[in-house]
Amino acid sequence: MGARASVLSGGKLDSWEKIRLRPGGRKKYKLKHIVWASRELGRFALNRDLLETAEGCVQIMKQLQPALTGTEELRSLFNTVATLYCVHQKIEVKDTKEAPEEVEKIQKNSQQEIQQAAKNEGNSNPVSQNYPIVQNAQGQMIHQAISPWTLNAWVKVVEEKAFSPEVIPMFSALSEGATPQDLNTMLNTVGGHQAAMQMLKDTINDEAAEWDRIHPQQAGPIPPGQIREPSGSDIAGTTSTLQEQIRWMTSNPPIPVGEIYKRWIILGLNKIVRMYSPVSILDIRQGPKEPFRDYVDRFFKTLRAEQATQEVKGWMTDTLLVQNANPDCKTILRALGPGATLEEMMTACQGVGGPSHKARVLAEAMSQASGAAAAAIMMQKSNFKGPRRIIKCFNCGKEGHLARNCRAPRKKGCWKCGKEGHQMKECTERQANFLRENLAFQQGEARKLSPEQDRANSPTSRELRIRRGDSPLPEAGAKGEGAISLNFPQITLWQRPLVTVKIGGQLIEALLDTGADDTVLEGINLPGKWKPKMIGGIGGFIKVRQYDQILIEIGGKKAIGTVLVGPTPINIIGRNMLTQIGCTLNFPISPIETVPVKLKPGMDGPRVKQWPLTEEKIKALTEICKDMEKEGKISKIGPENPYNTPIFAIKKKDSTKWRKLVDFRELNKRTQDFWEVQLGIPHPAGLKKKRSVTVLDVGDAYFSVPLDKDFRKYTAFTIPSINNETPGIRYQYNVLPQGWKGSPAIFQSSMTKILEPSRTKNPEMVIYQYMDDLYVGSDLEIGQHRAKIEELREHLLKWGLTTPDKKHQKEPPFLWMGYELHPDKWTVQPIQLPEKEDWTVNDIQKLVGKLNWASQIYPGIKVKHLCRLLRGAKALTDIVPLTAEAEMELAENREILKEPVHGVYHDPSKELIAEVQKQGPDQWTYQIYQEPYKNLKTGKYAKRGSAHTNDVKQLTEVVQKIATEGIVIWGKIPKFKLPIRKETWEVWWTEYWQAAWIPEWEFVNTPPLVKLWYQLETEPIPGAETYYVDGAANRETKLGKAGHVTDKGKQKIITLTETTNQKAELHAIQLALQDSRPEVNIVTDSQYALGIIQAQPDRSGSELVNQIIEQLIKKEKVYLSWVPAHKGIGGNEQVDKLVSSGIRKVLFLDGIDKAQEEHERYHSNWRAMASDFNLPPVVAKEIVASCDKCQLKGEAMHGQVDCSPGIWQLDCTHLEGKIIIVAVHVASGYIEAEVIPAETGQETAYFILKLAGRWPVKVIHTDNGPNFISAAVKAACWWANITQEFGIPYNPQSQGVVESMNKELKKIIGQVGDQAEHLKTAVQMAVFIHNFKRKGGIGGYSAGERIIDIIASDIQTKELQKQIIKIQNFRVYYRDSRDPIWKGPAKLLWKGEGAVVIQDNNEIKVVPRRKAKILKDYGKQMAGGDCVAGRQDED
């Protein structure tokens, strides 16, 4: 502030502080006002030192004067400088108002003096007014370099406006009178905008070449005293000196090289502006409710960016501004006439737009339209006589609009009779309810008819039927025997349904009109009295005579009712007669060939009980089903059908009507699988541009296609009665049901078959079909196109598929699949982002969905921070506070969505180009186009594949996403333009093995460029110090050490807390990078750390890795190498000892790597690894704990059931819709399992025989499933001599072992699922893993080892039993070591090689073989009296 205070000193400061800010005000000027003024001058590129002198103040005022019409701030600045000037000149002023007036007087006087002097001198020496070229005291032209303030102002403009249209006038103003050298200085200051500068350079080169073509250089030397003609490159300042530029600009006649170069730059800036704001002036149209002022703002903002001459821009303003206004404003503007100024236009159009204005205009027009002529202008002309009917609203009762356009709140109840509980279209008052009660529709099946059959008799067309006789409809039998249609005349609706009718003995031709309430005839004389009446006809009101109780005969059926006679254009038989004769309008089911459908093998239909429903739901469902039955969509069934699916009803959105829903989940599980006909939805960017387009919708799509007859029984459902008063009413579907899994696929394939003839017949028509949406495009003239569309609709109708007029779109924009299609462009349907105070999880999910949908055409949409709000397990209704970043992101997205953005259509003759830009950390955006600035499609990518990543890796992921998208939409891969230099890509691609293929691409200089921030050397750096690094941590205490040892004997160790081995390894590398010189070799034994750093990440989710990245960027060269741990390698062993002391318990575990490898493949449990690789349990458990697939549950401890070796439990389990049969050996837990095609007795028996052929099976234990109790299984068990036992019904514990094994097996299948393509492979892999790679339970064996051990032990035991029986026939005589007398005989229990085991008097002894005699016991008779053996009997 001190520097600026020096502007005034001493007495001047006193007089400054006496001047009032306002006339008569109390506040006076202070020093702070001078400080403020000096700051403001920086914005206008003016030197602040000018304030110190009166001349300086004059110069400032000259600069500011042209801009005084601008803001208030500018006016304040001018006034302050004027006051300061008065203080410098010692002109006495009391307040701010007086100062500018004084200045004005002085300026006028000096101007007159200058003019006078000019007259006197006769303008002999005109001084160039061109600044920065000025004349010095000697009269020479010299150059004043462009000031830093001007450059500063220019840089600010570019940074703030980012090449928006405002940049061009700003540039033009700042470069007033500049030389080419000055202009190049200005361009160099904004050289960071590389893409823009490149475009500018191209434009300048083109213009310079054009200049050289028009102004060829003269050949030979230049005559003395003359200056050379400038070339294109001279004008651009590249081959000319500053002196030459000044001479050209000040010569007589001058060559304004500065102005020419400036014009070229402005041309280039125009192109840049077009790229940065790619909206054409032709696209600026006023919205229906947009204020005229906003439209004008948008129009002129875009006009400034247009590349056109001033004349063309003038023409655009005169014509396009009016032409593209909305109809309301256009009417007013045209009335103003062609010469109207913009001010007049804006005044006239103030407040125009919106419904209130429309109502005002309409009211005025109606009040003026008194005569018939005015009425003719307002109303449509008609061919019918009589007065025009005035429309009146049912809802509010006012005239002039219909109820559907009414803005008043909706009146409750019916608009016709006023009663609540139904709407007008369901009202029975004054309306023959001919589509509801007593309808005669065949109850049988929809008959298959060939399209060639005569349509007059075909029930597949829309038709009217008239019932003969008064008998009500006979019930159709279960087999659809009621071929009722034979009794009825059938009138098809291919032509108008005209019939001959007998009235009062006269025959006349009349139209059967199901839409007319009354019967109206013309030119017929009827007997009896009549009364006059007015009725509303097609062309207005007509006067008729009303005759009551008239007999009428149609098709042999009589009816008595009211007939009206009057001037009707055609005789009409209305509903008052049609209902009496039982005439029905029938919606037949399509004659499309049915697609055969089956249940999955071995499965039966659903048998799910109907749950109770409320009375109102039962009533609603009864009504709906009656209607569906009349239309042939469902049929009643008897008790013979055992299947059932539950149904329920829900209220339709914003309506009192109910909607029937069927819970087909169980049937869907049991129905065969279908191939999804269409894998995704079509995208408009893949459409080709067509001259004529129509969008159609197939009405009641699924209900138009018949269901396979043999499958219908499985769709049975029941409408229950209240309090089980009567049995429920049972129905089954005849058509594709909503919610059944086969409906979409069958409908799509049927639709394709139906459309095939149309596609073949009209190859010039493009038909896109997605479910019931049809897009038809052609290059035909609109009349021919519409004729073809009618042909197509007719063709669809022959097959029973209607295309309602309500959803038939003839004019653009077409709404299709959530997109809005225009003739030459497309966009997504308008997206409204909700404004909310509190956002729930569900709200944010919907918001992200909307933004993702919009991102396919709106470039720059981001959702990263909004998605972050959804992290963690939250309930849908939880309220989530928005973070500042998410608020910012949402605000940016709202801004982007404000301006509508359009994509164009695909031109197969041009190549596709995809351009990618980096938007921010982990956020990318791309555009796919064929011509610049005309995007087919845009998109974003914001995934982060791994914790440590870099831009190159992400760029490859983006490219692969776009390539896939290209193949799906256009069938080809676009050519890529990527913001990465070829050298950078090559370096990374050759070094980093995980890089995937990327297609053909070229470099585009769009900042920010993707680069590798550092590079690791491939060979050790000679002369650089080598750091051996290591880290260790204790799992229990979380304490650790990290450190390094160098080849020069230096060492450093730090202690860490709350760490892990992996973190400690990274700490050691960070320490080495921190302590080392710019070039360093680092040796680690951690594969983990090596893997992270070799991928060259430039950012990471880990703070520690980010620190390492920072250190790596600072280094000149880094070589990182790995050595195996604990292998006695010099420096590695030294550092290992240092960091291990007091930390590591086990220093050397060689088997870890192999164990980890085995675990990745087989997911063995810790016991198996501990025993196979000699690992301590804690290490083996750690391997299991670090595996994400084995984290599902804790380690299972398999206890043993004490069972005999021949018992197996069998069961069937289901996975992925397939059946797996599982057999478990109860004693060992060993499994045999395989996928079987069906859960039948045959398959089960075959499996049991296979099992018996491999293992000794004595007993099988199964549940009571139909396959296990089948005859085939009994026969197999009888043949293989296996006893079959059954579990207790409904008690899963009786099958406990196999049930728990099913779970175990499914768990293992889940762990190895991604290694196998088919389930049967995964099952066998899981069996192998369970049997041989999991240890535990008795003996710590695996199940495979245990079963072999159990069977072997069993055989040995049996053998032993036999031996024991034999051995018991021997007697042993023995003697002790001290006693020479033989003792015995004792029982022989065991005879070994060196000793025998004997039992003597219940005492078991081991006797050496040499001291025992074994004799066979031949019985008593063999022994003599004095035989030693005789003692036995005495004993």
Swiss-Prot record:
One of its GO terms (biological process) is viral penetration into host nucleus. A motif (Nuclear localization signal) lies at residues 26-32. A lipid is attached at G2 (N-myristoyl glycine). A motif (Tryptophan repeat motif) lies at residues 985-1001. A zinc finger (CCHC-type) spans 391-408, 412-429. One of its GO terms (molecular function) is zinc ion binding. Mg(2+) 1 binds at D697, D772, D773. Mg(2+) 2 binds at D1030, E1065, D1085, D1136. Residues 107-126, 444-478 are annotated as: Disordered. Mg(2+) 3 binds at D1211, D1263, E1299. Residues 276-362 are annotated as: Dimerization/Multimerization of capsid protein p24. The modification Phosphotyrosine is found at Y131. The record marks G220, P221 as: Cis/trans isomerization of proline peptide bond. Residues 508-577 form the Peptidase A2 domain. Residues 108-126 have a biased composition (Polar residues). Residues 72-76 are annotated as: Interaction with membrane phosphatidylinositol 4,5-bisphosphate. Residues 7-31 are annotated as: Interaction with Gp41. Residues 1201-1351 form the Integrase catalytic domain. The keyword Thylakoid does not apply. This is Gag-Pol polyprotein. The gene is gag-pol.
